[in-house]
A protein has these predicted regions:
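Conserved SAM/SAH-binding loop-helix junction
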Residues: 121
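Cys-dependent protein tyrosine phosphatase-like superfamily
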Residues: 1-112, 124-172
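Short cysteine clusters
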Residues: 115
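Conserved G/P- and acidic residue-centered "switch" motifs that form tight phosphate/ATP-binding loops
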Residues: 118
Length: 172
């Protein structure tokens, strides 16, 4: 019997696609190829990877991007170091990637977002996408925590999101 790779669905305001919050494909006793097949079957048209290359190597997941693309899905790699807030490289890359993520969701395809465990950095990126669609920060965090209770447990993540929230609302 095939084991199921876990993911939690989240609607995005004003868009047809959903966010699929998930641990790293291949890290939950489900082979990576099977996990990706399951995410694709659930409607994923893209995968946003938030793990660093070093983390991917430690997990034996360096081929993740190639496998995602081989399945016909889009792969977006925006690494954030574990237990840290996004750095300048993320901040610089985000404006170029965000429109592509939203376009995918606008087309009704789902976006799988993952870090290693599928909570911390995953919740951060999901909240940012929800906030760019007009959802208030606290509401976005509440929706994500309902699915991933360990999201936003790090002060650096909450502080970074507070700063982004002020920028999005023009209060900064």
């Amino acid at each position: 019997m095939l084991s199921a790779h876990p993911f939690w669905s989240l609607d995005v305001p004003r868009l047809d696609g959903q966010l699929l919050l998930t641990p790293c494909p291949g890290s939950q006793q489900v082979p990576m190829a099977d996990a990706l097949a399951q995410l694709q079957l659930a409607g994923a048209g893209g995968v946003l990877t938030l793990m660093t290359e070093e983390e991917l190597a430690l997990c034996g997941s360096l081929s993740l991007g190639q496998l995602v693309q081989a399945r016909g899905m889009s792969w977006f790699h925006l690494p954030i170091a574990d237990d840290e807030a996004p750095d300048a490289a993320f901040e610089q890359a985000w404006p170029g990637v965000q429109p592509r993520l939203l376009a995918l969701l606008r087309e009704g395809r789902h976006l799988a977002i993952h870090c290693h465990g599928g909570s911390g950095r995953t919740g951060l990126a999901a909240a940012l996408l929800l906030m760019t669609q007009g959802l208030p920060q606290q509401e976005a965090m509440t929706l994500i925590r309902a699915r991933r209770p360990r999201a936003f447990t790090l002060a650096c993540h909450r502080h970074w999101l507070d700063t982004r929230g002020r920028r999005l609302t023009g209060a900064d």
